Regions:
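Short coil-to-beta-strand
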Residues: 7-19
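Short, small-residue-biased leader/transition segments that mark boundaries at the very start
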Residues: 1-6
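Short, well-ordered amphipathic alpha-helical segments that serve as non-catalytic structural scaffolds
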Residues: 34-48
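Short acidic capping loops at alpha-helix termini that bridge into adjacent secondary structure
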Residues: 53-58
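Short, conserved loop-to-beta-strand elements that form functional interface hotspots
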Residues: 73-103, 107
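Glycine-rich N-terminal loop/short-helix segment of MobA-like nucleotidyltransferase
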Residues: 19-30
Length: 110
């Protein structure tokens, strides 16, 4: 890949966009709920590697293949935060790598 999975700068951790691919198997999850869950699990593991948790996230950007997928993504997304949601942008894009339905990136603060 042409970028690191995350970069640390001035107490902030910038996590690259995470496709819904299981690192162990290389397989892409099925459906929007499964894909949202896998993208968020990838973020969770990256943050743990950086010594942080999902609670440290201050901003997410969600890229969706189609805005009609928003509700399915949002239902899963809500389960990853204890009511204290980070700021978020959700954007529909023309296409995502590997024909994924969703890609999620974030910024976390120590």
């Amino acid at each position: 890949a042409a970028s690191d999975v995350y970069k640390r700068q001035n107490g902030m951790v910038f996590v690259s966009g995470q496709l819904p691919i299981d690192a162990a198997t290389g397989q892409m999850a099925e459906g929007i709920e499964g894909q949202a869950r896998q993208s968020l699990e990838n973020i969770k593991h990256i943050l743990e590697e950086a010594g942080l948790t999902m609670g440290n996230i201050v901003k997410t950007t969600v890229f969706l293949q189609d805005m009609s997928l928003f509700a399915g993504m949002n239902g899963v997304y809500a389960t990853y935060f204890d009511g204290a949601f980070p700021a978020r942008s959700a954007v529909a894009v023309k296409a995502l790598p590997k024909d994924a339905l969703v890609e999620i990136e974030c910024i976390a603060v120590r």
